[in-house]
Amino acid sequence: MTQSQLRNGPDDNGLFGAFGGRYVAETLMPLILDLAREYEKAKEDPEFLKELAYFQRDYVGRPSPLYFAERLTEHCGGAKIYLKREELNHTGAHKINNCIGQILLARRMGKKRIIAETGAGMHGVATATVAARFGLDCVIYMGTTDIERQQANVFRMKLLGAEVIPVVAGTGTLKDAMNEALRDWVTNVDSTFYLIGTVAGPHPYPAMVRDFQAVIGKETREQMQAQEGRLPDSLVACIGGGSNAMGLFHPFLDDKSVEIIGVEAAGYGIETGKHAASLNGGVPGVLHGNRTFLLQDDDGQIIDAHSISAGLDYPGIGPEHAWLHDIGRVEYTSVTDDEALAAFHQCCRLEGIIPALESAHALAEVFKRAPNLPKDHLMVVNLSGRGDKDMQTVMHHMQQSQQEKH
């Protein structure tokens, strides 16, 4: 693909270069093909697009502001830093952008039951939210480890009428929850719509989720033009599966002047093996219906990912990111737990904004880069979610470090 066609993928088989595809059980194939057909039709349907725009505006609260972070900029003493304020959306993160799109599709297809997987709980909450709004049954699969560290979100899902099913398999995190959701889907093919929360899974999910999230990047283009009269020089976003990043990046892929940086979770450090950086520390393989970079051992078994942030500890990454990494269009770096925590505290103190620990990974990368850039360099960081859900984790870490000092 030439530079001018970077936004055209995937091909008809759902491939971005060597990544993506449809690796699913035979029973699911008709459903997947049906979903792809319905999505292609919906994309061209003015009524569908009109309804989507209505809910984005009046229910989600879009457009989200592009905010000049004056104090962060002063602190870094270099690039001019803008925050794309996705944490101000209804439910507190970017996840709702995709959920609104998919729930409208589910309704269009006559589905009565929604299932989803969740890690940090934000996608679970957003799914339960839209299911409540459209009066559909909702079942959320969530690993027991994540349930423990995200109790407030579990309670929110139940308040919204969803059934939360604990997954004890594996490490009881996102990968295991996704496995269970896929099993459920195979069993309940006719009535059920699987609302995947990230740019992973079998085709058409990676492209569909990206398209619903691309509202982030489209707004950013317009807002930056309005505020600065030109495009940004660089974009920074954190990456778990990669939907908030893809939403910001995709509308800029063909703009050669825009540098794009994705930030993975390095956990305790890439060299320790305790991390969630699939591109910086993984190899290609197949998981959850698509071929992408994965954390694997020498026998090809999936290794458990680690991150302080429940939303980043996925052992894979969206196939489009794998491809963009492969062709060198996007630079993928990583940030440790400690670096993310430090950035979290800086953002709280300097801007009065409590970011999600996921978003704090992107901020940490900004703190590394911005001081070395000229003052007219325009940098946009995707503030993908708010940190309310992370209070327990941060409190726990602060107590731990206090104890270690004594």
UniProtKB/Swiss-Prot annotation:
InterPro entries reported for this sequence: Trp_synth_b_CS (IPR006653), Trp_synth_beta (IPR006654), Trp_synth_beta/beta-like (IPR023026), TrpB-like_PALP (IPR001926), TrpB-like_PALP_sf (IPR036052)
UniProt keyword annotations, A-Z: Amino-acid biosynthesis, Aromatic amino acid biosynthesis, Lyase, Pyridoxal phosphate, Tryptophan biosynthesis
CC annotations in GO: cytoplasm
Claim: Lyase is one of the keywords in the record: yes
Protein's name in the database: Tryptophan synthase beta chain
UniProt cross-references to PROSITE patterns, sorted A to Z: TRP_SYNTHASE_BETA
Modified residues (N6-(pyridoxal phosphate)lysine): 95
Organism domain of life: Bacteria
GO MF term set: tryptophan synthase activity
Cofactor: pyridoxal 5'-phosphate
Subunit composition and interactions: Tetramer of two alpha and two beta chains.
Role according to the record: The beta subunit is responsible for the synthesis of L-tryptophan from indole and L-serine.
